[in-house]
């Protein structure tokens, strides 16, 4: 389940009432019967893509959902154009957010999905040059668009060769950075 911060911030990004609707759906699901012998809450993982609008809500969101869902994971917004206002630039503020997630991981080791090594990569460029993945193992996850065409250079890219490409040197994707943290790199 993707949440963009606490209710007020999430709703400012996704539309009024969307947070409460998502919350109600999750709480309704987890109040239901067990699934294959395990509690329903074990099925639910939350992911938050951190950006310039919601970075202040990381701790509050994690604490709000603790003991309600199984896991929460964090990644950072990846821009497609220079100057994207949602991108949280490398530097002091972003480093503080990463350090906050590391502290949460130490406090809730079985709840926070990110490893310290993986989230620490988010303090700087870990995988690309411009829109070209260099260290990134984008080859490890094959992604298709709605027509079955391969998306390039990665899961948020486009199958259109002339389409906008994500700026790899500002990548904040968790699905690839976790592979780099495990020692898997680009060709």
Q: Model-found features: residue ranges?
A:
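Radical SAM enzyme core and accessory elements
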Residues: 147-150, 157-187
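Radical SAM enzyme [4Fe-4S]-AdoMet core and its adjacent flexible, acidic
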Residues: 2-151, 158-166
């Amino acid at each position: 389940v993707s949440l963009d911060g606490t209710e007020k911030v999430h709703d400012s990004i996704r539309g009024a009432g969307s947070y409460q609707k998502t919350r109600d759906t999750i709480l309704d699901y987890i109040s239901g019967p067990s699934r294959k012998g395990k509690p329903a809450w074990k099925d639910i993982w939350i992911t938050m893509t951190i950006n310039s609008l919601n970075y202040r809500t990381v701790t509050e969101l994690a604490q709000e959902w603790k003991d309600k869902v199984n896991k929460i994971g964090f990644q950072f917004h990846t821009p497609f154009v220079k100057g994207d206002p949602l991108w949280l630039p490398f530097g002091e503020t972003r480093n503080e957010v990463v350090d906050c997630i590391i502290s949460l991981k130490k406090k809730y080791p079985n709840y926070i999905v990110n490893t310290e090594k993986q989230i620490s990569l988010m303090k700087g460029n870990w995988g690309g040059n411009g829109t070209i993945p260099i260290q990134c193992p984008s080859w490890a996850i094959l992604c298709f668009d709605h027509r079955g065409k391969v998306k390039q250079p990665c899961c948020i890219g486009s199958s259109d060769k002339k389409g906008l490409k994500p700026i790899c040197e500002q990548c904040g994707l968790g699905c690839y950075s976790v592979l780099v943290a495990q020692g898997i790199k680009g060709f």
